[in-house]
Design a protein with these regions (language model features):
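N-terminal small-residue-enriched
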Residues: 1-154
Length: 154
């Protein structure tokens, strides 16, 4: 459930929204820009093993290495880290260099199940206002379909 947008005073005024303290920057050398700080998906009630067993063919992504998001269109691409092929409900072989491609709003509409497992992590967000620390977390999420590109299955 989208609860609010990240807006600063200038863009909030343009959009008719109140500023919500979302502007961040690496240091005084950068102009502040409305950016994420802590982003997460709350845990659900689904069992991860049953979620995997329900997939005929897909991938299981355990980690994301890097990516980018167009803040205007919501289009994203993420390069996966540890990733495996799922065939007939079983995790089979590692997948090398997979790229997840889509639009945030579209993918959120395709979420079918949300696991009860949950992990928090940390990282960096790189943008025009510098590199800043971020917190993120989520459980295992099953998405009905997504564009996946890549080199090969190991």
């Amino acid at each position: 459930i989208l609860k609010n947008y990240l807006v600063d005073r200038l863009n909030g005024k343009k959009l008719g929204l109140s500023a919500n303290g979302s502007s961040r920057r690496e240091s005084y050398r950068f102009a502040p820009v409305a950016r994420m700080s802590n982003t997460y998906i709350a845990p659900g009630s689904d069992d991860v093993e049953k979620m995997i067993a329900s997939v005929d063919r897909g991938i299981y992504v355990k980690s994301i290495n890097a990516g980018s998001v167009n803040s205007i269109t919501g289009e994203f691409n993420f390069n996966t880290g540890e990733t495996f092929l799922i065939e007939h409900g079983e995790i089979t072989v590692p997948v090398h260099s997979a790229t997840l491609i889509g639009t945030g709003g579209d993918i959120l509409q395709k979420v079918e199940q949300v696991g009860k497992d949950y992990e928090l992590g940390q990282g960096f967000c790189y943008a025009g206002s510098g590199a800043i620390y971020i917190g993120a977390g989520q459980p295992t999420v099953k998405v009905s379909e997504m564009t996946v590109g890549g080199d090969e299955i190991c």
